[in-house]
Structure formats: C-alpha cells, structure tokens
Curated annotation (Swiss-Prot):
Cited PANTHER family: TRNA MODIFICATION GTPASE GTPBP3 (PTHR42714), TRNA MODIFICATION GTPASE GTPBP3, MITOCHONDRIAL (PTHR42714:SF2)
Species the sequence originates in: Carsonella ruddii (strain PV)
GO terms for cellular component: cytosol
Chief place where the protein resides: cytoplasm
CC cofactor note: Binds 1 potassium ion per subunit.
Signal peptide: none
Protein name as it appears in the record: tRNA modification GTPase MnmE
Example GO molecular function: metal ion binding
Names of the cofactor(s): K(+)
Binding site for GTP: 220-225, 239-245, 264-267
Kinase in keyword set: no
Subcellular location: Cytoplasm
Length: 438
C-alpha cells in the first residue's frame, strides 16, 4: 500500500500542527529531513531540513509496526502551525511519492491489517460524531467487548449448526433425535443473541437520529411565543401584528440528553399579496417532510375549522409525522389548561403567554422523543436478518438441504457485520464517513 499522510489538527490559527504519516517508506522520509537517529516510541526534538535549510524545530515520534494504529510504520511531526512551513513539508512528502490520505483511510488500514472489526469502526465513528452521555456509555470499551462477544457467539453457533447438518446430510442413519433437539436449541439461542444485538443497535440508531420539532399554524396564534418559552430564549420576535415571522427560525435544544432542533415557522395562509410571506409559507410546507413532530397551533377551540384556509397538500404531508394540536390563548377563551384526545389526536389547551402548562407539554414531547421505535428504517440489515431467522426457526423442518443453504446465507450476513465477508464497495461506504486524519 502507498505511503499516506494527513494533517490531523484543524486548519486555522493555533500554536501546533500535527502531520501523521503511515506506510512502508516512512523511515526513508525521516532520514532525508532529520539529522538525528529517531528511536521508536520516544519523542525526539530535532531540526527539520529541506534543501539544506532548517525550516523549523519539530517534535518527532516514530511508531514501528505492527504495534501501531494502522499496523504499519507511523511517524508524527509536531511542528509550529505556520502555513508556509506546513506547505513546505507537505510538498516534500508529495515529491517523495507519499499522497494525501482519504477520509477515514487510517482506520481503514487498521481494519485491512486485521487490527479491528467493522463493528468497532462503527462504534468509533459514533463516539466522534454524536456528543452525548448516552452515546458515550454505549460506545465505551466495555460495551464494545459485549458487541464482539455476541458476534463471536453467533459465529460459533452457526458453525456448529452447519457441521451438524452436514453430518446429517452425509449419513442420516446416525443422526438421532437428540441431535435434532440440539439443532432446535441452538436456533433458539441464536434468536436470543440476535435480539440482544438488535436492542443495542436500536438505542445507538435512536441517539444518532436527528429529531426535529416544527411549530405550525395560522398567523398570530402564538407560535413565536411558544417557541421562545420552550427554548428559554427570545430568538423569535413577538408582536400582536399578524405575519411577524417571515422565515423559519431554528434553535437546537437538549431533551433527555438528545439534541432536538426546534423550528418556528411563518403563519400558514393560502391568499396573501405579500411575496415574502408567500415564499415563507412555501418553505414551511416543504420543510414538513423534515419534521418528526408537528405542534399545530390554533387559537379558537373549533375542531371543525382546525385546518381551514390552509394549502391543500398540507394534510397529506402532516400525516407522515407525529402530531399534537395546541389550542392556545386558553386564558382568553376562558378555558382551563388541560389535555384530551379526539380520534387518537392529542389536543392540549395551553396559554403560551402565561407558560404554566409548558412543563406538561415538554413531558409529552419527552415521551415521543424517548420512543426508540420511532424510526422504523434504522438497523435494517440486522432487523431483516432477525425476521428471516425467526421465520426460519418457526418453519424449521427436516429438509436439511434447504436448512443448510439458508444457514450459509445467514453466516455470510453475519460475516458482513464483522467485515470477514465483504467487498470494496462495502468497505468504502463504511470508512468515507470518517473525518480526514482518522
């Protein structure tokens, strides 16, 4: 494999820049620009020479294979963060047949050299991208060991089953009833292991999912007031003039250690002469698909006219989301704040201005946000695997040729999870989600 390098510290002002190099020619690259003898795993302070000119003082660390991150020889240059110096060193590396690393290529080489599994790579990626306490707990080393233990057990049990069934195919007369019971029992254990794996992946995918809450409704019903109360800030302008909000205003907040995107929108109305207002309404309608929860606000307690005078395709789009109808200005209506249901639609009477019922509203939002089954398209590979295997277990028969072919397919799918059975496309799609320098 080619020698690769990357700047692993961010661009911009700073005191330090770190350049990481990995490959078989790293020792050769050092000798040309450093006059000192570089020892393994010892930080060496030395001058860097390019064209017999000292360009900088650097801290150099050399890691010898195979006990390195990538499984290859690695060198790290710790130099001053001066763009001229950095460019000189990068040009030197390019002239000596090294190349820029692709996103995630260091970790990809670690995987290709057999030092890590695909599941571990995914856990590392989640740890970097999603910064919350729950994700940290799920991706720490102890959890990683549980994942690997489950996969190891799955592989062992599948191999045992394949061996048993191949023996049965070879000489059925020596295959006893106890052997049949052993196969059924092993199938049952496999299902349990898959269920544990699915539960863990469900939580991880739930934490990865971006959750968006949109506040929709007609003009001057109190959407901006509610937005400010929930976010505990005053980013939306609040007046008694209809149509104050012309564009979508968004704010990120935290609920149950999960980041939520709150969106305040322009009032919905079909007929308007104001061009800016029309553009705002069209944007609202298009953004509905991006929302997970719709808080639809009205200010008159008249269920028949809830969706009066709004765009025709609005209702079709809103059906795809969770929906809570908020009847605002309960203090003016002379009604008590409260909650009730009509035809499985949750309706809450509130007063955004007083804000006394906002805590209760947050509780209902919490329940929807905390619903880990909310996203039905996550962890599809393992879920399909589980469903197929459940059906296979229920329909289990003595047609051992069929059983064996199904098991071998199942074994391949398990190997795809670990990376033992894969192809170039799968590897590329996995590692290109990482940052440069990882």
């Amino acid at each position: 494999m080619n020698t690769i390098f990357s700047r692993i510290t961010p661009l911009g002002n700073g005191t330090l820049c770190v350049i990481r190099i990995s490959g078989k020619n790293v020792k050769f690259l050092i000798q040309k620009i450093v006059k000192k003898n570089i020892k393994e795993k010892i930080a060496t302070f030395s001058k860097l020479f390019l064209d017999k000119e000292c360009v900088d003082y650097a801290m150099i660390i050399f890691f010898k294979k195979p006990n390195t991150f990538t499984g290859e020889d690695i060198i790290e240059f710790h130099i001053h963060n001066n763009e001229t110096i950095v460019k000189k060193i990068i040009n030197y590396l390019l002239l000596n047949k090294a190349r820029f690393a692709k996103a995630g290529e260091f970790l990809e080489r670690r995987y290709l050299n057999g030092k890590i599994s695909l599941i571990e790579c995914e856990l590392i990626n989640n740890k970097i991208l999603y910064d919350n306490e729950n994700m940290f707990q799920l991706t720490k080393n102890s959890e990683k060991k549980i994942f690997l233990c489950i996969i190891k057990n799955l592989k062992f049990k599948i191999n045992s089953l394949i061996i048993c069934i191949e023996i049965a195919n070879f000489n059925f007369s020596f295959f006893f009833f106890n052997d049949f019971l052993f196969i059924k029992y092993t199938f049952k254990k496999l299902l349990k292991l898959l269920k544990i794996l699915i539960d863990k992946i469900t939580v991880i995918n739930y934490l990865k999912k971006n959750f968006t809450i949109m506040i929709l409704g007609r003009r001057n019903v109190g959407k901006s007031t509610l937005f400010n109360k929930i976010c505990a800030q005053y980013d939306s302008i609040v007046t008694n003039i209809p149509g104050t909000t012309k564009n979508i205003i968004s704010k990120k907040i935290k609920i149950l250690s999960k980041k939520i995107k709150m969106m305040d929108t322009a009032g919905l109305k079909i007929r308007t002469k104001n061009l800016i207002e029309k553009i705002g309404i069209i944007k609202n309608i298009n953004k509905i698909y991006q929302g997970n929860l719709i808080l639809y606000m009205i200010d008159k307690f008249n269920i028949k006219n809830i969706f009066f005078n709004i765009p025709i395709d609005f209702i079709d789009k809103i059906k795809l989301n969770e929906l809570i109808i908020l009847v605002n200005k309960s203090d003016i209506l002379g009604k008590e704040e409260g909650v009730f249901k009509i035809k499985n639609i949750l309706i809450i009477l509130i007063s955004s201005k007083n804000g006394t019922f906002i805590k209760n509203l947050k509780c209902f939002i919490n329940k929807i946000v905390d619903n880990k089954d909310f996203s039905k398209n996550n962890y599809s590979d393992v879920k399909i695997l589980f469903n197929k295997f459940s059906f296979f277990y229920k329909e289990f028969s003595c047609n051992y040729d069929l059983v064996l072919s199904k098991l071998i397919d199942f074994q391949k799918n398990i190997f795809k999870l670990t990376g033992n059975f894969t192809n170039k496309k799968i590897i590329n799609s996995c590692f290109r989600n990482f940052c440069i320098g990882k």
